[in-house]
């Protein structure tokens, strides 16, 4: 059994990560889950949320937006729509997006076509703010 996981994260635009890590924690569609070396093979979906990985005593965080995770042979492949590291999140922009989504949701009802899109925008903004607020490595 390997002592590390090979973590690869890819978006449609680019490869975001290719790292040897000790563990990961991901926002699964059915709840948060973790993966350590030797984990049982797994294929699952991700929801919008905070993704983290640990290298030694350092923990790194990313905001991810919907995707898939495959765990096999001490390798974790993450395919997501978007992924932003702490350093690449513009906190002011994320807060502005949160404000816009909150304001728009106050004007809508669940019957409106735009309602669910605004809920998703609100969730993405909240996760981006949470990840940006981590203030560096955990």
UniProtKB/Swiss-Prot annotation:
<keyword id="KW-0472">Membrane</keyword>
<comment type="similarity">
    <text>Belongs to the ATPase epsilon chain family.</text>
</comment>
<keyword id="KW-0406">Ion transport</keyword>
<dbReference type="GO" id="GO:0046933">
    <property type="term" value="F:proton-transporting ATP synthase activity, rotational mechanism"/>
</dbReference>
<dbReference type="InterPro" id="IPR036771">
    <property type="entry name" value="ATPsynth_dsu/esu_N"/>
</dbReference>
<dbReference type="InterPro" id="IPR020547">
    <property type="entry name" value="ATP_synth_F1_esu_C"/>
</dbReference>
<dbReference type="Pfam" id="PF02823">
    <property type="entry name" value="ATP-synt_DE_N"/>
</dbReference>
<keyword id="KW-1003">Cell membrane</keyword>
<keyword id="KW-0997">Cell inner membrane</keyword>
<comment type="subunit">
    <text>F-type ATPases have 2 components, CF(1) - the catalytic core - and CF(0) - the membrane proton channel. CF(1) has five subunits: alpha(3), beta(3), gamma(1), delta(1), epsilon(1). CF(0) has three main subunits: a, b and c.</text>
</comment>
<dbReference type="GO" id="GO:0005524">
    <property type="term" value="F:ATP binding"/>
</dbReference>
<dbReference type="InterPro" id="IPR020546">
    <property type="entry name" value="ATP_synth_F1_dsu/esu_N"/>
</dbReference>
<dbReference type="Pfam" id="PF00401">
    <property type="entry name" value="ATP-synt_DE"/>
</dbReference>
<dbReference type="GO" id="GO:0045259">
    <property type="term" value="C:proton-transporting ATP synthase complex"/>
</dbReference>
<comment type="function">
    <text>Produces ATP from ADP in the presence of a proton gradient across the membrane.</text>
</comment>
<keyword id="KW-0375">Hydrogen ion transport</keyword>
<keyword id="KW-0139">CF(1)</keyword>
<keyword id="KW-0813">Transport</keyword>
<dbReference type="GO" id="GO:0005886">
    <property type="term" value="C:plasma membrane"/>
</dbReference>
<dbReference type="InterPro" id="IPR001469">
    <property type="entry name" value="ATP_synth_F1_dsu/esu"/>
</dbReference>
<keyword id="KW-0066">ATP synthesis</keyword>
<protein>
    <recommendedName>
        <fullName>ATP synthase epsilon chain 2</fullName>
    </recommendedName>
</protein>
